Amino acid sequence: DKELINKKLEKIIICGTSLKDKEYLENLEYFKWLKFPKLNKPILGICGGMQIISLIFGGTLIENKEIGLIKIQFKKEFLNFKPSLNEVYLLHNYAAINKDFEVFAHSQEFEISQAIKHKTREIYGVLFHPEVRNKELIIKFCR
């Protein structure tokens, strides 16, 4: 219920799944509430959560398996990250592409979007897993 979400929740985190779990991509109808115009809660999508957000807002996915630690370049300040090179942990099969989101960070090797924000709403996405190596991002979002 969209009204209940607005009344009961302060912020929303949509987390990822295991590499083999692609069921969320086949059940996007469960996430259509993300586009509800009156939903004014900050949302953070992590890995599969970023992919879901991108698809719900009309984006696409490309196959892009990345596993392990890599360095990504932040172009602008994003939650707790300053513009700089940062080491993050990746574990995904797909990358998300969406023109309604600004790219704040990308992987250097493939130019894959790693941190995005909706251009007009407080909706963020990260393809990497901050719960593994960059917990301060989650803490900053939750404050």
Where on the chain are the PLM-derived regions?
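Catalytic nucleophile loop
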Residues: 49-50
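Residue-level detector of intrinsically disordered/flexible regions characterized by low predicted structural confidence
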Residues: 43, 64, 119, 141-142
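RNA-binding accessory domains that recognize and position tRNA/RNA substrates
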Residues: 5, 130-143
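Flexible gly/pro-rich beta->alpha loop and the following alpha-helix that scaffold active-site loops
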Residues: 1-45, 57
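Pocket-forming structural segment of enzyme catalytic cores
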Residues: 55-123, 128-136
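Glycine-rich, phosphate-binding/catalytic loops in enzymes
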Residues: 28-33, 61-62, 105-107, 141-143
